[in-house]
UniProtKB/Swiss-Prot annotation:
NCBIfam families listed in its UniProt record: GGGP-family (TIGR01768), PRK04169.1-1 (NF003197), PRK04169.1-3 (NF003199), PRK04169.1-4 (NF003200)
Family, as annotated: Belongs to the GGGP/HepGP synthase family. Group I subfamily.
Gene3D superfamilies linked to this entry: FMN-linked oxidoreductases
Keyword check for Lipid metabolism: yes
Matches recorded under PANTHER family: HEPTAPRENYLGLYCERYL PHOSPHATE SYNTHASE, PTHR40029
EC number(s) reported in the record: 2.5.1.n9
GO molecular function terms attached to this record: heptaprenylglyceryl phosphate synthase activity; magnesium ion binding
GO annotation, biological process: glycerophospholipid biosynthetic process
Designated name of the protein: Heptaprenylglyceryl phosphate synthase
Source species of the chain: Staphylococcus aureus (strain Mu3 / ATCC 700698)
Record-listed Mg(2+) binding positions: D14, T40
InterPro entries documented for this protein: GGGP/HepGP_synthase_I, GGGP/HepGP_synthase_sf, GGGP_HepGP_synthase
Record note on quaternary structure: Homodimer.
Length: 230
């Protein structure tokens, strides 16, 4: 079993987006700590299987971040289950999870399931609209969410998601200071080695996604943060 606490860098691939075989090979051979498959819309069983089958040729951890029950399947090392803490719709807190457990609970290996306390921060993102997230958050709001995740829910991961834009470093720093046990994931807008370095100095793990489809060379440079220590 892999130890996710040692992961500093994850590449996140959207099964609904095209990636060439050469670019996928470069991503999987880049020394990233893991590959995560996940997206907001058009995530289907077919496109998840298609992408998973290509990545499985490489010897690195593979994660499915669950966005709908229909695309859940065996064959992944971990299943990351988001609970969107700032969603106004209970379905994105635990409603989808409830349905999944009713259907698959008898066959789940819970050692492979990681519960993520998600906070969505970009109002213009697809994920914010889809999850009906309240993104009008102060630093104090985020600190309270961090305390909730770390001390009360005791979740293994808190994921600060800016999805498409580079986040407010001071707010991410404030969250980090309140997490003593929970691992901090940051994702959103990382498009350069400099941004990756800046966020990796605060978060335990950075998630790099969109830039893969815009500039593969810049995406690959973000892996260099593994050479530094947090």
């Amino acid at each position: 079993m892999y130890d996710i606490k040692k992961w500093r860098h994850i590449f996140k691939l959207d099964p609904a987006k095209h990636i060439s075989d050469d670019d996928l090979d470069a991503i999987c051979m880049s020394q990233t700590d893991a590959i995560m498959i996940g997206g907001t819309d058009d995530v289907t069983e077919d496109n998840v299987i298609h992408l998973m089958s290509k990545i499985r040729r490489y010897p690195l951890p593979l994660v499915l971040e669950i966005s709908n029950i229909e695309s859940v399947m065996p064959g992944f090392d971990f299943y990351f289950v988001p609970t969107v803490l700032n969603s106004t719709d209970v379905a994105f807190h635990n409603g989808t999870l409830l349905e999944a457990l009713k259907t698959y609970g008898h066959s789940i290996d819970f050692e492979e399931v990681i519960f993520e306390g998600y906070v969505v921060c970009n109002a213009d993102s697809k994920v914010a609209k889809h999850t009906k997230a309240n993104t009008d958050l102060t630093t104090e709001d985020l600190e309270a969410y961090a305390q909730m995740v770390n001390h009360m829910y005791r979740l293994p991961v808190m994921y600060i998601e800016y999805s498409g834009i580079y986040g407010d470093v001071s707010k991410v720093q404030a969250v980090s200071e309140h997490l003593t046990e929970t691992q901090l994931f940051y994702g959103g807008g990382i498009s350069s080695e400099q941004q990756a370095t800046e966020m990796a100095a605060i978060a335990d793990t950075i998630i790099v996604g969109d830039i893969i489809y815009k500039d593969i060379k810049k995406a690959l440079k973000t892996v260099k943060i593994k050479e530094s220590s947090k």
